[in-house]
Amino acid sequence: MRFETRAVHSARGHEPRDPARELGQPHVPGIDLSTTYGFRTSSAAADSMEALIQGEAEAPNSIYARLHNPTVAGFERALADLEGADASVAFATGMAAITAVVMATAAPEDGVRRTHVVAVRPVYGGTDHLLTSGLIGSEVSWVAPDDVGEAIREDTGLVLLETPANPTLAMVDIRAVVARVRGAEARIGHHVPVAVDSTFATPVLQNPIALGADMSVHSATKFLGGHGDVMGGAVATSETWAKALRQVRMITGGILHPLAGYLLHRGLQTLPVRVREQQANARVLAERLANHPAVSEVHFPGISGDPLELRLLETQQRGPGSVLSFRVREGSDAARRVVEGLRLITRAVSLGSVDTLIQAPAHLTHRVVDAEDREASGVPEDLLRLSVGLESVEDLWEDLEQALSAVALGRGSEVESAHGVEPLVSLSV
């Protein structure tokens, strides 16, 4: 089946021609909110408990919702199908998913602790802080993609990257990184998993597993949910790594709530349509921003004509996506005034929602990263990140253009009161 069909029918929990649909079965998967489940015999319950403790995806009998929930499992199966993976494991948030990846890879099956992580900047600010702070006992080496292989040591347990990267939209050649890692494995004598945060691309535009990565990580809060009303994270991977991730989830407790699982499951059905329509809007805005005199730089895959980006848009990623970032020519104060001068676009963190969101990463999503590290990874204070939604692209451009032009003319955000329009306010943090 083609991707769009799988997105709809995997999310409904049956194949399109399943006769059961005509036998009084629910058309939409239900929500199982139970925290615990009864059992007939202690021995049967013990067998099921053992299977879940070992990280199995299913057991003969459900035991406890922290170990397994049918609603969440339905979402996991559907996402794995779209990613071309053996399995996926869902978590309460994207950060819970990333944390589980770091923990699971630090303690592989051979029992040797490998807490060293090789990572490529930029990444999401929370991920950067998790690795840099050593909060869960990890040590990180930040390197350029070309230097990943040389940075791998005997105690390296993970290579982590984002592509496109948050918030610069920098693209990394996944195949090339995987090849460097596999080359280094011969030197150190063990496998080093490669995890790719593919949140910006979604399974619609990119499948890291098919490119050789071991794990494809998502903040499901973003595009997978798509409406700004559900939080979650997920890792698509092999069944071997899925078992390890389920064991981490079982002990740390970062489980996805069943209602969130239901909403994410539902969100997959419209994911291809949303991603492509949002991408079409983003293309238009990126091109217009690149030609606006108040804008000094636009970051959007392919717009600069960079040969690597153009090649990866042919061989790795099936489109640029719908997130872009741009720098305001007059600096950080001017960037602030642009944001505060907007009337339609929502001032809020997060991304991937049906409405358009804007924020300054250096002040919000990447504030936790050291200032020097932010600058070095291409996140200056005058950079604005725009997650493009499903509104009319002309309405979005009119809003951006009036805010940019007001700043260019030196009026700033006082244009709001001059037009008698109160700015939209978001309570999102």
Give each language-model segment a name.
Residues 7-28, 32, 333-373:
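C-terminal core of ALDH-fold dehydrogenases
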Residues 30, 41-96, 126-133:
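Conserved N-terminal alpha-helix of the aminotransferase class I/II PLP-enzyme fold
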Residues 148, 331-337, 392-398:
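Short, conserved charged micro-motifs
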Residues 15-19, 87-294, 299, 414, ...:
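Conserved PLP-enzyme active-site core in the AAT-like
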Residues 283-355, 369-375, 414-423:
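Conserved small-domain helix->loop->beta segment predominantly found in fold-type I
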Residues 86, 141, 183-184, 340, ...:
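PLP-dependent enzyme catalytic core of the Aspartate aminotransferase-like
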Residues 263-273, 322-329, 385-389:
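Short, well-ordered beta-strand elements within core beta-sheets of diverse protein domains
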Residues 1-59, 412, 416-429:
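N-terminal glycine-rich, Lys/His-bearing helix-loop that initiates the first secondary-structure elements
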